[in-house]
């Protein structure tokens, strides 16, 4: 989460070319999950709970999102946690429904529904409320890897802004396209 010099960007480009060049499949989460389920591939980068949870919910508990025990991040951590929030913004013309909507999505039943939005299943902050947590079945908790969430988070740093994101994305996109 820092600005990278030319040597670092060159190394990133070379790594992206090597990773995507050696990939059997390059695709979106659904494509990658199908390839995992069918046995076409053994792993996919990058992912996590959100990427394999639908496949786990469909009866594939052998698939798991795994955070490396160590890596190049601060403190030697190997993962990055991505936490999304819903909030109002400092807008002089804030919708009168904004606060009402926030209250709605905080309700235990709604938060449970949000946790299982189509395509990705995720833990939600409202699970700290027993009224919400109690709505989750054993199978749903298993699908979102609740058993290892604390451990995965401990191995991760919080996401931050990547100053040269656009340049890195261009390099990665070019490497993916070269794969074909």
Regions found by a protein language model. Name each.
Residues 1-67:
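Ligand-binding pocket segment of bilobal, Venus flytrap-like solute-binding proteins
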Residues 49-53, 71-73, 93, 108-109:
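Solvent-exposed loop/turn segments at secondary-structure junctions
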Residues 27-30, 92-96, 159-166:
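Soluble non-cytosolic domains of exported or imported proteins
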Residues 143-180:
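Conserved C-terminal helix/tail region of periplasmic/extracytoplasmic solute-binding proteins
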Residues 13, 17, 33, 37, ...:
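Non-transmembrane alpha-helical segments in soluble domains
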Residues 86-152:
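Mature extracytoplasmic/periplasmic domains
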Residues 83:
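Short coil/loop residues immediately preceding or within conserved phosphate-binding loops
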Residues 61-80, 89-90:
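Short beta-strand->loop
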């Amino acid at each position: 989460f820092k600005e990278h010099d030319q040597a670092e960007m060159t190394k990133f480009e070379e790594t992206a070319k090597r990773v995507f060049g050696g990939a059997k499949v390059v695709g979106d989460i659904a494509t990658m999950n199908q390839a995992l389920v069918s046995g076409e591939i053994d792993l996919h980068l990058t992912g996590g709970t959100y990427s394999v949870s639908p496949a786990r919910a469909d009866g594939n508990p052998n698939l798991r999102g795994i955070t490396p025990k160590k890596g190049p991040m601060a403190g030697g951590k190997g993962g990055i946690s991505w936490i999304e929030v819903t909030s109002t913004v400092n807008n002089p013309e804030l919708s009168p429904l904004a606060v009402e909507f926030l209250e709605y999505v905080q309700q235990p039943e709604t938060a449970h529904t949000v946790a299982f939005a189509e395509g990705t299943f995720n833990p939600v902050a409202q699970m700290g409320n027993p009224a919400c947590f109690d709505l989750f079945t054993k199978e749903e908790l298993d699908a979102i890897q609740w058993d290892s969430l604390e451990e995965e988070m401990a191995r991760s740093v919080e996401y931050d802004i990547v100053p040269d994101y656009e340049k890195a994305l261009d390099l990665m996109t070019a490497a993916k396209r070269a794969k074909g």
